[in-house]
Amino acid sequence: MRRNCCHVSFASTLKILNFVQAFIGVSIIIYSIWMLHEYSRHLPVDPPPSASSSSGTEIATSVSEPLKNPIDFVASIILGSNGGDHGFNLRSLDLPAPWFIYSFMAVGILVCIVTFIGFIAAEAINGCCLCFYSILKTLLILLEAALVAYIAIDRHWEKDLPYDPTGELSSLRAFIEENIDICKWVGIAVVAVQLLSLLLAMVLRAMVSTPKPELDEEEDDENPRSRTWDPLLGPQGNQAPAGSSKIENWSSRIREKYGLNQSPPVNPKG
């Protein structure tokens, strides 16, 4: 496939946007590694007393009750009812202590993977790669939108999460609340970069997936060439007798010059 200036310009812009997103992903991974290093140096904070006061009997009953009434359990998850102890609670999950750091690092790795696929798609300018990148980018944007909507709707979202012994979740929330204006503009800029990269990928894929006009133009370019060869071949065939006549004239002149055409004299009979 031929790459015109429009393809190259769109691909270069997509590479720049992916570079910005890769910088964000690498920054998240580096910050997660720093948090994990700081957590390993210091002792973890003791869990709240409510988490340590649960007995084995209560845990067994809380696990067996949803199995006895599965319909009520599913309805409580969908409707979000707090009646009884059937509501799904993330605090009941057995997660490692630095779960927030691992989750934060997973977000950075996911961003880097999607960005790497975007680099490949922008370099190859392939329809399949661009389509796959567009799907991944759409899923990532939808996941971010769902997370923001959940935090905006549920004012007590921290109570639904497991306890964070590292304290990084609370410190991150305090930092965002102190610099809410800057964080808003940074979030808007990140979302704008992601949406613009998705738009460029879709436009570039649409441009790549329609190569038929280019093939027609190539065929039209080839037909005039074949037509131009026809008149050139025709006169050459017609010029062949003229060339042979010139050779005959030249040979006849040579014979006349050297007397080769003169017939020998005939002796008269006496």
UniProtKB/Swiss-Prot annotation:
The lineage of its organism: Eukaryota, Viridiplantae, Streptophyta, Embryophyta, Tracheophyta. May be involved in the regulation of cell differentiation. Promotes intracellular multiplication of tobamoviruses, probably being a component of the replication complex. Residues 212-249 are annotated as: Disordered. The gene is TOM2AH2. Keywords: Membrane, Phosphoprotein, Transmembrane, Transmembrane helix, Vacuole. This is Tetraspanin-18. Homodimer. Constituent of tobamovirus replication complex. It comes from the Eukaryota. Its main location: membrane. Residues 236-249 have a biased composition (Polar residues).
